[in-house]
Structure formats: C-alpha cells, structure tokens
Amino acid sequence: MSQPTTIPGIIRNTVANIHPENHTFLLHKVKDSWVEISYGQALEKIDAISAWFLNMGIKKGDRLSLIIENGPNYVYYDQALQQIGAVNTSIYPTLTESEIEYILNDSGAKAIIAGNPFLFRKVLKVANNCPSLIRIIPAFDDFEKHSDKLKLNAGVINFEQLIQEGLGLVEQYRHQINAAREAILPSDISCLIYTSGTTGIPKGVVLTHHNLFQNVVNSLIQIPFVEKTDRFLSFLPLSHVFERTIYHISIYTGAQIAFAQSLELLAKNMEETKPTILCCVPRLLERIHDKAIKNGTSAGGIKTKIFLWALETGKKYRLVNEAGKKPGILLSNQQKIADKLVFSKIKAKTGGRLKFMVSGGGALPKNIGEFFGDLGITILEGFGLTETSPVMAVTERHRVIYGTVGRIIPGIEVAIQNVDTRHIYTIQTHDNFKEDLQTEEGEIIVRGHCVMKGYWNKPEETATVIDADGWFHTGDIGRFYRGNLQITDRLKNMLVNAYGKNIYPTPVENTYLKSPKIEQVFLVGDKREYITAIIVPGRETMQETFGLNNEFFEKTDVFIEDKEIVDWIGHDLRKLSNELAKFERIKAFKVKRNPFSMDDGEITPTMKAKRKVIEKKYATDIDQMYLQETEAD
C-alpha cells in the first residue's frame, strides 16, 4: 500500500502497516469500566456510516456537521464522512443557538450529529431556519421525547439506528466507498473549522487534506518520539484544530486514543488510563502548578521544608542539563531523593507513564514551564492558529527554552515583519535554524503547506490576511529568540495608553497570574492614562481563606466590595507589580465574584478573553476605576 496523502488514508495505512485489525484503537468509559475498541470494530462502523450517507445521496464536497463531545462516535462519524470526500464541519458544543444556526446556514450543512439531549435541543430550535439541513442525528437513546411533537423539515434518525441500517448497505456500497476514498485529492477540502474569535461573526476556515496531512508528518519530524506503544488522553474539544492534530498524529503513528469523560474527571481518568501523551492549554497547567504549590507549602513543618528543598534541587538539576552539562554525583543523588519524596507523588497523579505534554492555544507562562521542568515533566509548547492547520512551531525535547514556542516545522517559512513599515526583518525555515538568532519584534507571518485555503464564502476577508506573495498575516506579535519563535501577544490586543506607550496584555496578565490567589486577569487601559484590571480570585483559595460558603458566589452583585478581600488581592498585585515597568502596572482594580465564562460569551473555547465583549459589558464599572483608584501599585 502506498503512503497516504489524505486524512482517510491514514487509518488504512495504520491497519496495513502498523497494527492488525484486532489491536486496540480507542478507549472510552462506559459506566464504571473502560471499554477497548479495536481498529476492526471501528472500521466496521465507519464503513457502515459511509454507506448510509452514500445511500442518502451525500457526495464529495457536501458539508456534514458535528456538535458532539469527544469520544468514539466523533471518530466514527468523522472518518466516515472524510472517506467519501465530504467535509467535516464541527461546531463547538458551547456555542449559542444563533451561532449554531449561522454555521449550519453558512456552511450549507446537510446533516448534523448531536451528542446529548442538551445539544440536540439546541439544534432542534434552529433546524427549521436551516434550509439545507435534511438529517438530524441524535447520538443517544430516548431522543423522541425531545423531537416527536415538533414539525421538523429535517428527518431525525438515532445514530445507532443509522449504523445498523448502514451495516446492511455496506456490501452494496463497498466499491463506491473505496473508489471515493481513492479519488480524494490532497487539494480537496477536509474540514471547515469556524473560529469563534474574540470579535465578530464566526469565520469558516477552509483546510485541505494537504494542510492537515502535511502538518502531521512535519510536526512528527520535530517530535519523532511519538510511537505505536503510546497512549493519548483526549479531553480538549475535537472541534478545535489543536486537539484534532494530535488525534491525527495518534492514528498516523498507531498510538491509542483514550477519551476523558470530562474536564472535571480528567485527574481521575489520567490515573485510570495512564497516558503517555496529553494535550492541554496553559490554564490547566497553571491550575496543576497552583494546587501542587498550595499542597506542598500548606503541609507545614518538615513536609514543607522537604517540598521546597525538592523544588530547589529540581531547578538546579534542570539548569545543569539545559546548559549542556552532566550533573555531578551529589546533585544526581539529590535529584533521585527529590523524585522519590516529592516528584513521583505528583507524577503518579498523571498515571505515572507521562512522556510529555503539549501545551497550545495560548502562551505558557515561563514560570509554569520551568516548574514542570523542575519536576522532570517535559512540556512541549506548540504555536499556530486554526488558519495555519495549526502547527507552525513546536519545542524540540532536547532543546527546551522556556518562554518560547520552539523551532519552525519543516516545509514552511516564518517571517517577522515590522507592523508599521512592513519591512521583513528575517525569514526563517526549519533548515536555516541558528541557535543564536535574535531578532526585532514584529508581526509573525507565514507561508507554505500550513496556510489555509481561505475563509469559506469570504473572499474579501481572505484577501486581508493572505497577501499577494502568499504570506498569511497571523496578527500575533513576536520575535526569534535563541533560534526559537517567541510570542508576545495578539496585535489587536495591544493597548496604547494616553502617553503613546504600547502595552501587551498577555505578558502583563501572566505576571499577575503568578499569584496563587488569582485565577483570571483582564487588563484595561487603551487610550487611558493608566492600567486597570478586573481580577477573578481563585474560588477555592478564597473560600478557605475567608470561610465563604457557596451562597457567597451566588449573589447577584458582579463585583466583590468587601475591603478585606480587595486588600488581600491588592497585596499580591503590589508585590508582583515590581516585576513590571511602571506604565504596565495595575493602578486600580475590581474583584469579580465569578470567572469570565463561555456561557456568558466572555471567553472563547480556548479560554481567550473576548476583549471587546468584556469591555462593553462592564463599561460602567471600568469607567468607575478611572474616577476613583483602588491602589495596587
């Protein structure tokens, strides 16, 4: 069998050349037990679904939508539609009904699978406003009570029933399925991924099989240690391209995929499944860091002393290794003791087999990466956007430089361009890598196999981000540091104060997030005389410190006025302000009772703040901070 060049070719290649059909492919929890699904079992369902869709009249290029949690059903549906040349159009489960309606109509989706009753009801409410939608597929039992009384233009069929009907059609359509799979070209569209964005209407990013496949093979050149014996624990939404890339990499290498039940059960699922690979966002790593520090320092007495000694030992050991030197006998022995007494207990919470974690979807604060490095847990940072398929750069395991996102992957060019003059400071590739390269800061632009085909139905918007020379303008500000790409912030996030000083919120916010008291920081200050912020304290820490019950967080007042709590936060803000330039320091702040959330439309699914939404929503409260300062500096 020739090497694959498209997404549906990957799983067939794995079965032909890496694992037999009876080898475990997927794992998911059913009631109290983890159930293994072999490649053969998965392919049987995948072919059945393909046959059913062909019988329905689905053809190459048709869009088929998903609004479903991670799990085997996502894989079956995705692989089935991909191999007949249809286009995966995933929808974030957290999106509103109006956003779902917009995506279904903009994409012209002909079918949608809904993962649970809540998501099914969302789809039902907008279905009759979507003329192209002809099938709604609930992936759960007892769906009739939600849909029977409704007059729907689209037909409704349970996913399990669809599969059973498809099994009876497979032989009839076997040749057509195989022919459809072979007819897919690398230039054909594989998926539409609608970026929620921090502003405006969602845009459908058009990614081809070439985009996604090349991202897989070239990322693996950078991280060649993903193997067929690995196990990936999936919990970030597969509707996001970052998680989907690791899903593709797992299939390509023959690694198993286990599906976490939920974010709340992630810690338990890690201990149960013992993964070797995990993808996460920086906020999760920050929470693990905060909890570990809190547990280690609150024990008191000799336990706290041992914990702090172990961290210091881990840091010394890491720094020696990073300098390319060999640790001495004394330090090596101390490291073994630190690992036995402290680090091994933290690692055990991950299942004890973790080779590395990949952090993406935002910049990882330098101190968080260093903390995990001190424990002996490798964090590889990746960088990219939905529009870049997504990976542009990823850390090499032998060359971790905290605060950077690694080396450019093969096959693409990345340049740093002056925002005002458009002068290009440097163009870098994987092959011209220089360890000592340091450049000016500017907008990161990229061209090559990773760049999207464009925005669906939006040629003008496509032309604003992909220039005549093929450069995609990411909107991210960064530079090269010690050969690696380093991200500062989003260009559109930049604040320019009343005195003309440029302030990038993300690095400033990350400085204040070093406080274990603080969960979220939202900086304000564009065209203002000084910086202010909305601060969200960590709920658990605040409850323990002030003896608060759950009713406190259910109060209708958005902001906490209690002077004791405000001063408690202010103490850490003043201390951390010393790490910043004076014009970057928070001068006034408000303490928000509950976190910014996706449900309230304040953050994206990748936990990025929707700055314009938040500024508009809390405009009156923000204005008050410029009338009367709550001193933090």
PLM feature spans:
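Conserved pre-ATP/AMP-binding loop-to-beta segment of ANL
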Residues: 22-24, 137-138, 156-194, 201, ...
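Conserved AMP-binding A3 loop
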Residues: 36-40, 160, 181, 190-216
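Structural core segment of the AMP-binding/adenylate-forming
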Residues: 55-56, 79, 83-165, 568, ...
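AMP-binding/adenylate-forming catalytic core of the ANL superfamily
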Residues: 95, 112-114, 448, 453-454, ...
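Conserved ATP-binding/catalytic segment of the ANL
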Residues: 423, 432-497
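Conserved C-terminal "lid"/linker of ANL adenylate-forming enzymes
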Residues: 520-523, 529, 548, 570-633
